[in-house]
């Protein structure tokens, strides 16, 4: 530096600012290079190439002097371009570090030459920038020495460059020498800092009092009430004051790094009185400090190695050993501090939440609290995540703090409160700056009599800028920029801290105190987020993912801490603050890490709440099941009888019966049941989930409640399906009424979550239950609709035909024969089917109906094949049914008549079950949506039948459970069987009715066709034929345009003729003649097209009357 330069031309302030910012960027880049080289996945491929292994060994051995013509380096020839491209970023990062080191050394020399006076209490910003530069330079050179592949990377790149360009890269000689010099970075730096030790020592000595004050124990903090904003109620509105506000929230770890590295680099100063004590005090605080992110510095070991061998430093080495031995005491000190901080910050949060107007006057105390809490958290993290030296009797468990989540939560609460009331702070400090500050500044400036023109301009600009401020700027949303003012103040500190300057800063302490407060106030206007990040940024957890996740899991498992677990996803929003513009390539990896972490935490919280809720629901369902009527007999028996057992002493021991609800009677409030504990855990966890509506993380917004809603939906869906207890192998399923009862009990339990979380459980229920009305849910899993449809169609209806189950119109259910283990009525009575309708809803019942129609279509398809097989005989029967002799002969020629009747019965059974579920659905919907059902009924009755949209109306009515003349679902199912020519179609289906008509008399020869008056049903379900004939005729005629009334009249005529011929048969052969006669009456009664006068015209009513009399006289074995 030329001595002719004036103090303003030296630009010390600007250079310090730029170099500190660039130093952080260089640390970021060298950090990423170190991590990349130590990870096999990201390490440059050239360094692991077997073919280049001899070349790399040669380069490392000869570094930095290498013979480019050496045979070992020939392998690089073919890949020189790839090597230069792959390693250029690494190489030029080291070049930038070398240039940074040179510029920093030049600036430190210039500062020494100018005799700048440093005092943290006088020129805070200048002193801080100076000490930061020293620490940054030291950390950077230590990081360089930790890159294991530095020689191979630099040598390989330079050799490839030389082979390509015919010369060595211009920076390589100096760079190679720097790598050699800084193999032992501390010793080399100590040599270089010999000329600077006077300035460094002066700056560090100004820290002694501050460090002692900030290193007090937690008990001393508590006694001094350093973080209490209500310790003096009379002064609660008085703003927090300090001569140097930034010192109040300056972190101890920062001061500790300054002292350790500063005095160690200038180790000659350690012999000075008072300095050794401060240095030893810093050495006793743990065993490591942070270099950068998760790179730590084991200072006892490193300082010992540095001073070992130096003459006259035996006492200093002894001091290091003594400090290491006393390290265990710091664990208890920090634990006591954290205990105080938890209560103090919680108290502060509660007061500020009630009175946010105190944020302005008490902002300095808030930042102070956040600062020391941040410092304690960082201390704990780095000591928990790095093993203590083996010689010390300390384990990682000694550093673990189970209440860390509480402290993290308190920090996040204060941060969110400051961010929430940002405009309040801006209004307060704008008024402060434009009022008190500018008034006092004018008075202070007037007292300064002699100053240069540059200094005068700077102070005038202060007054002008502050005078132009007003609250209206805040109200209009104007952005403030005070960075120029702060830089001018730093310049002013540099100008007036040089020896011989006029005026000197130390002679104008009023100006210093005022401008320090102005800078502090300005930061709380335009740099609120940056100031918060400075004192409470927890992005360090991004680089300790294992510890971060482990702490979260422990917090989630600890009922006393679970309410604070929301702090962990909130901290993920800090991760992006650690990125640097000097290393943009790390933004995406860190951003992805933050997104995956917040997603993991919120998902785990929601899953834990779901698991607890599932246990609560299970207990509630068990209690609800105790009130079922199926348990009534057992409970009455237990209440009536006294269970007594005799012990060895022949004494009677009474076993007390515990009725349902006994758990609600408490003998003591202190006794907690397992359900109480679960509810308490759920309450705490829900408090965490509902703490915030949204968590912003790297341009994404996460909503914790939505995670809980998603988990509840998944849990509720699985629970509903599991309640059905569908067992495919054993063909079992739970009764619909039981499932519905359990679902309602679970819904009642889940609805209680609204008291804790505000989650819209109605939306959860609607979403899940609506999916359960479909055959598959949104995840592709089977639903209860699919399960019940499969069971009723593939299991139950098959049993109807094979196990002697009968459909009883009188009971409106299917019933069993006596002695059967399976009770069909438990699945088909009115209550069960109404419960099924509630579970499956209109969509699910329609799906069940569609599947039944497909089965009917399958049966009709087989009937069609049988009709075509017997077509000629049926055509003859159709024209000769009134000729007995020919008719009998033709009937004998028919094939598979029993098969036709069996299939008609099957169709009738399916249609009867369809009728039952339609009636159940109609009943349920009339209760749930009476107005809508009345509208549907009115439209069905009054909509014109000739209109083209009539089919749509019928489909709507059928879907609502109402009965239509022609079932549109059946029509749609049978439409696939339609012939191309309608004449052929009409003939085929007409012959089917002829086949059924002539086949009915065959039922009279079977014992199973007997009619049961109690059930109003035939034992073989032959009475269901009436439903199949009417429904199929209506659907087939609707599809092919035929007249169903004509077809049924023809069917009635042929059937009557066939049945009347039974009178000529012998009585002993006709086992159920009267029972079969009743089928004619049933067909007419259920038909919308036929009337009784049509029946009387072809079949004597006297026979029907006698048949009814005859069948009701018989006594049948009762059905269950």
From Swiss-Prot:
Entry-linked InterPro entries: Nck-associated_protein-1
Membrane is among the record's keywords: no
GO CC annotations, alphabetized: SCAR complex
Keyword vocabulary terms for this entry: Cell adhesion
One Gene Ontology term from the biological process aspect of the record: cell adhesion
Keyword Metal-binding in record: no
Task performed by this protein: Involved in regulation of actin and microtubule organization. Involved in cell adhesion.
Name of the protein described by the UniProt record: Nck-associated protein 1 homolog
Species name: Nematostella vectensis
Gene it is expressed from: napA
